Each structure stands twice: as structure tokens, then as C-alpha cells.
Amino acid sequence: MADLEEQLSDEEKVRIAAKFIIHAPPGEFNEVFNDVRLLLNNDNLLREGAAHAFAQYNLDQFTPVKIEGYEDQVLITEHGDLGNGKFLDPKNRICFKFDHLRKEATDPRPYEAENAIESWRTSVETALRAYVKEHYPNGVCTVYGKKIDGQQTIIACIESHQFQAKNFWNGRWRSEWKFTITPSTTQVVGILKIQVHYYEDGNVQLVSHKDIQDSLTVSNEVQTAREFIKIVEAAENEYQTAISENYQTMSDTTFKALRRQLPVTRTKIDWNKILSYKIGKEMQNA
């Protein structure tokens, strides 16, 4: 092992450490970071070389953050990334600095985003917050209004998690929805993601995603927002139901087939008579 360490350059060590961090299960960033820190044994190298991994993890995971002085949490996503460690809170029209390692927001300041699309963004946000409150007790959502390739675009992000370290499991739901404001009809594109880690007496992860496409009728802001939420609700309910049904089927069939109900001899062992069996005698003589 010592020889291998000597063969690895600092760049290679950081690259390996960054991969561990980026792939940390939800709710387990600190544990993975601390383990990597011990393995690397060079705090300066880790902080400087793997800083991009800290940022990528938070962007990928839709990490929610509370800003002091404001009621609602906001999600850290690529759509709100203003560069230089600053992020947008479109609801409160502010930008703030975000520490990707400590996961803390500081220095909130007024920020004016795309005013031309703000009425559409607000309508979608109002409808989405009501939906999230009903379906995700711990959910957080952030809605952006941006001009992309010259088109006014709405991007809606949802995050909900449950971290149960005492019960050896953590899980996170993420979904991202996007559509452009065009006359009559537009295309809604979404991606739904589930990631769960269970690690009591084993190490099992569920990592699943589904891409969605649907048509949306565009009328006024409020009605369009309602129709959009109907698409979101139908798709997310269908996906969650399918996941549950698949796992029930696997439990009833696949996993049962993996278990041998009787040993190869087709006879159950009488543990009270174990010494009379050949294996018992071998154990006794060992």
C-alpha cells in the first residue's frame, strides 16, 4: 500500500478523492469527506484540489439552504449559479454567497433577474409550492425564469429528502421541469431522480431516473401554471407508484428465487443433533 501511495501523484490522489465525494450518497457528504480526508492526509491539497467536487455535489443534489432573514429555503442548482460562488434566490430577488463545504449562505443582496418573464415565473412558483406542500412534507422547490437561446424559459426544481442515519438509511428525491413560453402549445421536459442508500448489515443503493416529455397548452399565466402542475403530478405519481410496485414484485419473486429453501441434500439440519453429522464431527476435531 505504501508503494502504491508513492506511485500516485498529488493530481491522481485528488482525482480519486473527488470521485468519492461526488458520488457520496445523499446525507452522507460529511462522512465521505472525513474518510477521504484521513486517506489523503493533506487538508490543503484536498480543499484546493477537490473544491470543484464539493460544488458539483451540491449542484447535482439540489442542496437546500436557508438564508438568514428569509423564511423559505432555496435550492443550489446550476440554474441559479451566478459564478464566483454566488447563487440566485429568484423568489426573494436576491443573490448570496454559498460555501460548498460548510453548506452555508451569506451576504444576501438585492438582485434583479429577467423581469420580462417574472409574472410567468411567479404563477408557476405559486402553483408548484402548493403542490410540493401537499405531496412532499419536507420538500423544497425553486422556480427560475430565464432566457435560453432567445426563448423565455421556465425551470422548476423540486427536492425532498429523508436522512435516517440512526436507522441506517438516507434518501433523496429530485425532479427538474422545463418549458418555454410559446404561443398555443409547448413541450414540457422533465427528469425525475431517486437515490436511496441502505447500509444496515449490508450496503445497498437505489439510483433511478426517468425522462418525461409532454405537451402543455399555453394560455394565460395562471391557467398555464395549473396545467403544468397537472403534468408534474401525474408523471411523479406514476413514477413513484411504478418504483413501489417493482420492488414489491422483486420481493415476491426475484429475491425469493435467490434463496435456497432447503440445502443441497433436500433435508433440514436438526441443530440439536449437529454432532451426529459429518460436519459436526469435523468441527469437533478441528
Swiss-Prot record:
The modification Phosphoserine is found at S9. GO terms for cellular component: brush border; cortical cytoskeleton; F-actin capping protein complex; membrane. The keyword Iron-sulfur does not apply. GO terms for molecular function: actin filament binding. It holds the Pfam family F-actin_cap_A. One of its GO terms (biological process) is barbed-end actin filament capping. The keyword ATP-binding does not apply. Transmembrane segments: none annotated. InterPro entries: CapZ_alpha, CapZ_alpha/beta, CapZ_alpha/beta_2, CapZ_alpha_1, F-actin_cap_asu_CS. Keywords: Acetylation, Actin capping, Actin-binding, Phosphoprotein. The modification N-acetylalanine is found at A2. PROSITE patterns: F_ACTIN_CAPPING_A_1, F_ACTIN_CAPPING_A_2. It comes from the Eukaryota. PANTHER family: F-ACTIN-CAPPING PROTEIN SUBUNIT ALPHA (PTHR10653), F-ACTIN-CAPPING PROTEIN SUBUNIT ALPHA-2 (PTHR10653:SF2). Component of the F-actin capping complex, composed of a heterodimer of an alpha and a beta subunit. Component of the WASH complex, composed of F-actin-capping protein subunit alpha (CAPZA1, CAPZA2 or CAPZA3), F-actin-capping protein subunit beta (CAPZB), WASHC1, WASHC2, WASHC3, WASHC4 and WASHC5. Interacts with RCSD1/CAPZIP. Belongs to the F-actin-capping protein alpha subunit family. F-actin-capping proteins bind in a Ca(2+)-independent manner to the fast growing ends of actin filaments (barbed end) thereby blocking the exchange of subunits at these ends. Unlike other capping proteins (such as gelsolin and severin), these proteins do not sever actin filaments. This is F-actin-capping protein subunit alpha-2. It comes from Microcebus murinus.
